[in-house]
Amino acid sequence: MSEKTEQTLPAALFVSNEIIAREVELGDGKKHTLHFKAVSHVVFNRWVTALTSTDEAVRDRAHSRLVCASMVDADGEPALTIEQADRLKPKVLRTLGDVIAEINDFADMRGNA
């Protein structure tokens, strides 16, 4: 019998737990430091599925759920609730979506949130 060799997988395969700080201009025209984390393929797939759902309520909350999954406080805890995310100004949502796209390398997503 051959012994199974333990393989070390590259960290680049996985979502990092790193908390990423970004200066983001919000609706008041001022820059604020916000924190984000990368999302997994599962969260990404849920977002895409929600965007194409036949259920209007699911589609309406797709971007809110993505923002909630990625935006955190400095300690990595969720920064806002789904209810708060639902109340984001459209321009702010688009800006946050662009930051989330950059962090996750979703080039095609920029400008779609």
Predicted regions span which residues?
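Extended acidic low-complexity intrinsically disordered regions
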Residues: 1-20
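Short acidic-hydrophobic surface loop/beta-edge motif
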Residues: 18-29
